[in-house]
């Protein structure tokens, strides 16, 4: 556990990047980051990943097994990359719910998908991953891409995702993870703490938000730890696939 107590009555703390902050403040601080970067979020994704994020998301969709008529929940769906693709897969008899806790990101996603004409079977919901406002056993598939590391209580969020899935439903977590070799790890550290804040400054005039994002990646559970968290929450057949030498991993679990 990342939480620390400084006294019997002190508020628990958690990490915000490399800082320890009161739990009640983390969501506010994360919200400020995404309010700041929402307008140019897609551009920054392309710049920072060299377009690789599109391949990572495509592989996640292939693993999802989503088909016509399914009901899909995309948590931290932001600007709608996954939701747009799921919309086409589920077709007119299916439904996609794009959920995000951040209203700025949700607005960008809604506007973008409406402009593209692909929002007919997509519902937009402002929601907290830890307390999903949906019925039990409701979705065939739940996804969260590059969002779990920003959640304060990750274990609660994973249990919430389990609750809203139908038996046999799939959870897919796409997230930055731990590189699998030392050379890649050193290169990735240099890239993250030098280039990412610089690009953030040049493109969004916000170096600090991208410094936080780099730090948040380092504080996120590694591949095996996240797998164990999913098993502990109640998922079966939990597996993960490393991509780009473990810089990114996608975890998949099935609700019994």
UniProtKB/Swiss-Prot annotation:
Catalytic activity field: a 2-demethylmenaquinol + S-adenosyl-L-methionine = a menaquinol + S-adenosyl-L-homocysteine + H(+); a 2-methoxy-6-(all-trans-polyprenyl)benzene-1,4-diol + S-adenosyl-L-methionine = a 5-methoxy-2-methyl-3-(all-trans-polyprenyl)benzene-1,4-diol + S-adenosyl-L-homocysteine + H(+)
Domain of life, source organism: Bacteria
Basic and acidic residues biased stretches: 1-12
Organism: Pseudomonas putida (strain GB-1)
Pathway the protein acts in: Quinol/quinone metabolism; menaquinone biosynthesis; menaquinol from 1,4-dihydroxy-2-naphthoate: step 2/2; Cofactor biosynthesis; ubiquinone biosynthesis
Biological role: Methyltransferase required for the conversion of demethylmenaquinol (DMKH2) to menaquinol (MKH2) and the conversion of 2-polyprenyl-6-methoxy-1,4-benzoquinol (DDMQH2) to 2-polyprenyl-3-methyl-6-methoxy-1,4-benzoquinol (DMQH2).
The protein, known as: Ubiquinone/menaquinone biosynthesis C-methyltransferase UbiE
UniProt GO MF annotations: 2-methoxy-6-polyprenyl-1,4-benzoquinol methyltransferase activity; demethylmenaquinone methyltransferase activity
Lineage of producing organism: Bacteria, Pseudomonadati, Pseudomonadota, Gammaproteobacteria, Pseudomonadales
GO biological process: aerobic respiration; menaquinone biosynthetic process; methylation
Pfam family, one: Ubie_methyltran
Residues noted as binding S-adenosyl-L-methionine in the record, renumbered to the chain: 79, 100, 128-129
Region (Disordered) residue spans: 1-23
This enzyme's EC code(s): 2.1.1.163, 2.1.1.201
Keywords tagged on the record: Menaquinone biosynthesis, Methyltransferase, S-adenosyl-L-methionine, Transferase, Ubiquinone biosynthesis
């Amino acid at each position: 556990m990342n939480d620390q107590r400084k006294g019997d009555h002190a508020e628990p703390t958690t990490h915000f990047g490399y800082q320890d902050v009161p739990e009640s403040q983390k969501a506010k601080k994360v919200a400020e980051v995404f309010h700041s970067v929402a307008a140019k979020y897609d551009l920054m994704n392309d710049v920072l990943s060299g377009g690789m994020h599109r391949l990572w998301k495509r592989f996640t969709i292939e693993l999802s097994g989503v088909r016509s008529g399914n009901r899909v929940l995309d948590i931290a769906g932001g600007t709608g990359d996954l939701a747009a693709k799921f919309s086409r897969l589920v077709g007119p008899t299916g439904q996609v719910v794009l959920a995000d806790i951040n209203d700025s990101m949700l607005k960008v996603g809604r506007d973008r998908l409406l402009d593209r004409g692909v929002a007919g079977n997509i519902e937009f919901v402002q929601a907290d991953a830890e307390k999903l406002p949906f019925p039990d056993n409701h979705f065939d598939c739940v996804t969260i891409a590059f969002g779990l590391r920003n959640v304060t209580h990750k274990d609660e969020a994973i249990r919430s995702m389990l609750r809203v899935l139908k038996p046999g439903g799939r959870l897919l977590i796409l997230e930055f993870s731990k590189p699998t070799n030392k050379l890649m790890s050193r290169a990735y550290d240099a890239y993250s703490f030098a280039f990412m804040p610089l690009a953030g400054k040049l493109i969004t005039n916000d170096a600090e938000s991208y410094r936080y994002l780099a730090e948040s990646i380092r504080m996120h559970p590694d591949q095996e730890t996240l797998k164990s968290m999913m098993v502990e929450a109640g998922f079966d057949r939990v597996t993960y696939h490393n991509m780009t030498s473990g810089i990114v991993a996608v975890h998949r679990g099935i609700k019994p």
